[in-house]
């Protein structure tokens, strides 16, 4: 193909894309993961919203709130509720004449505490402050000082949402936020809403942080099939009128509910199905488009899960994937066998292996993320042992993990 033909082909592709998203989409952004719908579109989380708001409530009158940690698996509404409650709190505070700073930080995308502070600073920084929050070039203490100065000068209270807080290298940020008022760094009350997929995150906090970061905890359960169907039904105005076949939403909901009720996955699957229909220049989105889109959604979901894992979690996952790949006649592997291959992975990568107990903990964390599954077995001497199985395609894990 010469350059003119290539140019014409590219123009042809772009010409199929309208401002709204082709013939299929009307408002494609409604299916984006970070889209926060209005309250009447939030499904199955009324009780959780009320409880979180109750803990944060005093902030709207400028009083110290209770900080909280929200736990739960991916796609169960944790981030959505945190964002929604902080948004409503800001509006209610404004109605009462209280200037409330609110900011959201995805810690998986932050490169550490300094970057997280920089992102929060930019979110709350009014143009007239004259304070700068560069992406690099200043110390962590300087980022803190600049955040404190903005809060002290322009606000009466503050909320910070730390999504995927377990992805930070340490809990120093929680420690500093919890002690900011006590040590005189800041004159306004600060409420922290931390969000984590890891239910044992608190166990990894230092004793100092546990003592200082007084908080309440909530665990969000996965959505069921009916709730996911309602969530998707509430997002159908992402599509042009009449383009969705009747079976598309029930099928997408059933697929997602079967795999631990992940609403993010359901929306991603529906969005990809619409994209697939657009690529085919189809008039309607059919169930067959869901089938085609599912493979892409699976790869993206797994990549999202493992991209934020620390190196040794990836090493353990690769060990389990290698066992699965090399022993197609077996599904389950004992901890000691996984550890043997883990040691080989560490040797190849030049990493110092962790202890056997820590290896077991990392396997259990993979189970919590539903990358792996576990079961208990009984040996000849009536002793118990654990076995693990990979819940994803081994070839995909090996490709993405490396």
From Swiss-Prot:
<dbReference type="Pfam" id="PF09079">
    <property type="entry name" value="Cdc6_C"/>
</dbReference>
<feature type="binding site">
    <location>
        <position position="223"/>
    </location>
    <ligand>
        <name>ATP</name>
    </ligand>
</feature>
<comment type="similarity">
    <text>Belongs to the CDC6/cdc18 family.</text>
</comment>
<dbReference type="InterPro" id="IPR014277">
    <property type="entry name" value="Orc1/Cdc6_arc"/>
</dbReference>
<keyword id="KW-0614">Plasmid</keyword>
<dbReference type="InterPro" id="IPR036390">
    <property type="entry name" value="WH_DNA-bd_sf"/>
</dbReference>
<dbReference type="Pfam" id="PF22703">
    <property type="entry name" value="Cdc6_lid"/>
</dbReference>
<keyword id="KW-0547">Nucleotide-binding</keyword>
<keyword id="KW-0235">DNA replication</keyword>
<dbReference type="InterPro" id="IPR041664">
    <property type="entry name" value="AAA_16"/>
</dbReference>
<dbReference type="InterPro" id="IPR036388">
    <property type="entry name" value="WH-like_DNA-bd_sf"/>
</dbReference>
<dbReference type="GO" id="GO:0016887">
    <property type="term" value="F:ATP hydrolysis activity"/>
</dbReference>
<dbReference type="InterPro" id="IPR050311">
    <property type="entry name" value="ORC1/CDC6"/>
</dbReference>
<dbReference type="InterPro" id="IPR015163">
    <property type="entry name" value="Cdc6_C"/>
</dbReference>
<dbReference type="InterPro" id="IPR055237">
    <property type="entry name" value="Cdc6_lid"/>
</dbReference>
<dbReference type="InterPro" id="IPR027417">
    <property type="entry name" value="P-loop_NTPase"/>
</dbReference>
<dbReference type="GO" id="GO:0006260">
    <property type="term" value="P:DNA replication"/>
</dbReference>
<protein>
    <recommendedName>
        <fullName>ORC1-type DNA replication protein 17</fullName>
    </recommendedName>
</protein>
<dbReference type="GO" id="GO:0005524">
    <property type="term" value="F:ATP binding"/>
</dbReference>
<dbReference type="Pfam" id="PF13191">
    <property type="entry name" value="AAA_16"/>
</dbReference>
<dbReference type="InterPro" id="IPR003593">
    <property type="entry name" value="AAA+_ATPase"/>
</dbReference>
<keyword id="KW-0067">ATP-binding</keyword>
<comment type="function">
    <text>Involved in regulation of DNA replication.</text>
</comment>
<feature type="binding site">
    <location>
        <position position="235"/>
    </location>
    <ligand>
        <name>ATP</name>
    </ligand>
</feature>
């Amino acid at each position: 193909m010469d350059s003119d033909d290539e140019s014409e082909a590219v123009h042809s592709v772009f010409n199929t894309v309208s401002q709204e998203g082709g013939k299929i989409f009307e408002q494609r952004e409604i299916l984006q993961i970070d889209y926060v719908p209005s309250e009447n579109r939030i499904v199955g989380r009324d009780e959780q919203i009320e409880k979180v708001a109750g803990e944060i409530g005093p902030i709207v009158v400028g009083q110290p709130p209770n900080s909280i940690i929200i736990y739960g698996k991916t796609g169960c509404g944790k981030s959505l509720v945190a964002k929604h409650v902080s948004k409503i709190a800001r509006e209610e505070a404004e109605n009462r004449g209280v200037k409330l700073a609110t900011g959201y930080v995805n810690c998986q995308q932050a490169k550490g505490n300094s970057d997280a502070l920089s992102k929060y600073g930019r979110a709350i920084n009014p143009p007239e402050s004259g304070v700068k929050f560069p992406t690099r070039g200043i110390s962590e203490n300087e980022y803190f000082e600049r955040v404190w100065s903005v809060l002290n000068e322009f606000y009466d209270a503050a909320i910070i949402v730390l999504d995927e807080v377990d992805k930070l290298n340490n809990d120093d940020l929680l420690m500093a936020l919890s002690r900011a008022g006590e040590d005189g760094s800041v004159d306004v009350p600060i409420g922290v809403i931390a969000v984590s997929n890891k239910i044992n995150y608190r166990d990894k906090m230092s004793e100092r942080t546990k003592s200082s970061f007084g908080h309440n905890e909530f665990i969000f359960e996965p959505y069921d099939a009916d709730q996911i169907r309602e969530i998707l039904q509430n997002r159908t105005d992402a599509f042009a009128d009449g383009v969705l076949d009747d079976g598309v939403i029930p099928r997408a909901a059933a697929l997602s509910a079967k795999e631990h009720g992940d609403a993010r996955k359901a929306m991603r699957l529906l969005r990809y199905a619409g994209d697939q229909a657009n690529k085919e220049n189809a008039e309607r989105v059919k169930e067959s488009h869901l089938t085609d889109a599912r493979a892409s959604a699976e790869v993206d979901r797994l990549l999202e899960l493992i991209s934020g894992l620390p190196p040794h979690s990836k090493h353990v996952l690769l060990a389990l994937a290698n066992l699965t790949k090399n022993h197609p006649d077996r599904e389950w592997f004992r901890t000691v066998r996984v550890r043997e291959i883990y040691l080989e992975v560490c040797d190849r990568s030049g990493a110092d292996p962790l202890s056997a107990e820590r290896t077991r903990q990392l396997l259990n964390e993979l189970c919590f993320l539903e990358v792996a599954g576990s079961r208990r077995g009984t040996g000849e001497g009536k002793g118990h042992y654990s076995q693990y199985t990979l819940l994803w395609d081994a070839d995909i894990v090996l490709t993405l993990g490396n």
